[in-house]
């Protein structure tokens, strides 16, 4: 088990990660609001959770992770009423689409995906405890949290509530940091067809912020080691979660470490439908983009840095995957019967150093970009070694290199470890290359170019090197 340093949004600095139980690190992540397809900004946040999960496991920790499904909020109620469907009928297809998107980008599935509507009793329990603490008041049949009565309000977002006018409040779920007001815990129905529950605190439905506090309590009993989400959720959502949970259960620790992933830009601009740069994963796949390249790009930058999504960056991601895969394919041609072993013990001094540097990069606040530098340094060395030996290396050496690439891919999840070698196809390619060489000797450049184009159309690239002609698959 390797010591990890995380940047904790609560303290504003890197800290040694000290989970209550390293063999069961508890993690809660804010998931999708299922009223439409997730956009690629959402996807970056979801893939950050995937990198966190994979990194914790690779560094020796056990995990118990949750991502919620928000299946009741203002937007869902608005759109379900417009479509004349029940909440469940409306949200089920969007929930299924979310899981399909996760599969498309090879995200590992978590232990829990609770729906907000499944935790109404836990929400009522929190409200009742807050009422007992004197932190709740009623107005127009809605229940509100009085933030001025909670001493610790603002400790995550570092806002100052001293200038807030007493009794000002918000009924909507989302609002700006510059306009702090009391937030709603429980809303009475205002429109015909609006979903509601009959409870001991009144007929209504939960405010968005209450939902996550309740789901954490239902699954974990108290608090969690790590809570993640996009930086846009830091205020008001996560600040309000703290207020509710610590207000209701002041004797308990709610969250030890807060991790927030930064915004995604598209072609250097904030994503917006009005700008025409708003994309879902399905939009991009429909345009012919490789899901592996999308995944690789979205996880390649440090999670606390803004990431620019562009056609050039996607092309770069595709090229980088090809570089790694081409090196792997060369090795698989040598050691065709290799089995990937997650518990493999590296023997070579070089691979041991790469493994250590890769782990240290991830343990440094999930520094994936630094880890990638280790990957490409090792690729350069492996390819140079294979070139110097003209691919005539022992299977044991090839296997060592294959295992280190597999180790890297436990984070990136983009490689194919099935051998691409097919003797029949290879012999045909070799025959065509020999024919091309003959054509070039005879100065039949038209025939030479035609063979090159024929091979290229089949995904075969020819490289003229000082050691002779080498070919590889794209």
UniProtKB/Swiss-Prot annotation:
Pfam families: CysS_C, DALR_2, tRNA-synt_1e. Monomer. Belongs to the class-I aminoacyl-tRNA synthetase family. It is found in: Cytoplasm. A motif ('KMSKS' region) lies at residues 270-274. GO terms for cellular component: cytosol. It catalyses: tRNA(Cys) + L-cysteine + ATP = L-cysteinyl-tRNA(Cys) + AMP + diphosphate. Keywords: Aminoacyl-tRNA synthetase, ATP-binding, Cytoplasm, Ligase, Metal-binding, Nucleotide-binding, Protein biosynthesis, Zinc. GO terms for biological process: cysteinyl-tRNA aminoacylation. Its EC number is 6.1.1.16. Its main location: cytoplasm. GO terms for molecular function: ATP binding; cysteine-tRNA ligase activity; zinc ion binding. Zn(2+) binds at residues 30, 212, 237, 241. A motif ('HIGH' region) lies at residues 32-42. Gene3D superfamilies: Cysteine-tRNA ligase, C-terminal anti-codon recognition domain (1.20.120.1910), HUPs (3.40.50.620). Binds 1 zinc ion per subunit. It is an enzyme of class 6 (ligase). This is Cysteine--tRNA ligase.
């Amino acid at each position: 088990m390797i010591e990890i340093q995380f940047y904790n949004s609560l303290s504003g600095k890197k800290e040694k990660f000290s989970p209550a139980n390293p063999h069961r690190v508890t993690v809660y992540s804010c998931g999708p609001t299922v009223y439409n397809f997730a956009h690629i900004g959402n996807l970056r946040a979801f893939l950050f959770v995937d990198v966190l999960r994979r990194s914790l496991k690779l560094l020796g920790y056990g995990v118990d992770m949750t991502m919620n499904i928000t299946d009741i909020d203002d937007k869902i109620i608005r759109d379900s009423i417009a479509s004349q469907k029940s909440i469940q009928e409306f949200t089920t297809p969007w929930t299924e689409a979310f899981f399909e998107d996760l599969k498309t980008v090879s995200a590992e599935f978590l232990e829990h995906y609770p729906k907000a509507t499944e935790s109404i009793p836990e929400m009522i329990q929190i409200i009742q405890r807050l009422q007992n603490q004197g932190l709740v008041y009623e107005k127009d049949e809605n229940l509100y949290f009085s933030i001025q009565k909670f001493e610790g309000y603002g400790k995550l977002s570092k806002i100052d509530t001293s200038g807030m006018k007493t009794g000002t409040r918000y009924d909507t779920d989302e609002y700006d940091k510059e306009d702090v007001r009391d937030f709603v815990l429980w809303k009475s129905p205002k429109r015909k067809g609006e979903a509601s529950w009959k409870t001991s605190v009144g007929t209504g439905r939960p405010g968005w912020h209450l939902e996550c506090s309740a789901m954490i309590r239902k699954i974990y009993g108290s608090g969690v080691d790590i809570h993640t989400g996009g930086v846009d959720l830091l205020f008001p959502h996560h600040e309000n979660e703290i207020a509710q949970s610590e207000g209701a259960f002041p004797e308990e620790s709610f969250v030890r470490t807060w991790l927030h992933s930064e915004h995604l830009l598209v072609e250097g601009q904030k994503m917006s439908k009005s700008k025409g740069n708003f994309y879902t994963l399905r939009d991009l796949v429909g345009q012919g983009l490789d899901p592996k390249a999308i995944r690789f790009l979205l996880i390649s930058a440090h999670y606390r840095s803004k990431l620019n999504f562009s056609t050039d960056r996607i092309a770069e991601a595709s090229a980088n995957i090809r570089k790694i895969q081409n090196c792997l394919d060369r090795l698989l041609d040598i050691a065709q019967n290799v089995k990937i072993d997650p518990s493999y013990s590296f023997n070579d001094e070089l691979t041991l150093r790469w493994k250590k540097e890769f782990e240290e990069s991830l343990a440094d606040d999930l520094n994936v970009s630094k880890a990638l530098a280790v990957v490409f340094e090792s690729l350069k060395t492996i390819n140079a070694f294979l070139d110097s030996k003209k691919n005539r290396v022992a299977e044991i050496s090839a296997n060592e290199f294959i295992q280190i690439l597999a180790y890297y891919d436990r984070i990136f999840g983009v490689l194919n470890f099935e051998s691409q070698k097919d003797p029949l196809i290879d012999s045909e390619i070799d025959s065509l290359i020999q024919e091309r060489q003959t054509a070039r000797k005879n100065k039949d450049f038209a025939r030479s170019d035609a063979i090159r184009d024929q091979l290229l159309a089949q995904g075969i690239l020819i490289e003229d090197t000082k050691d002779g002609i080498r070919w590889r698959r794209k």
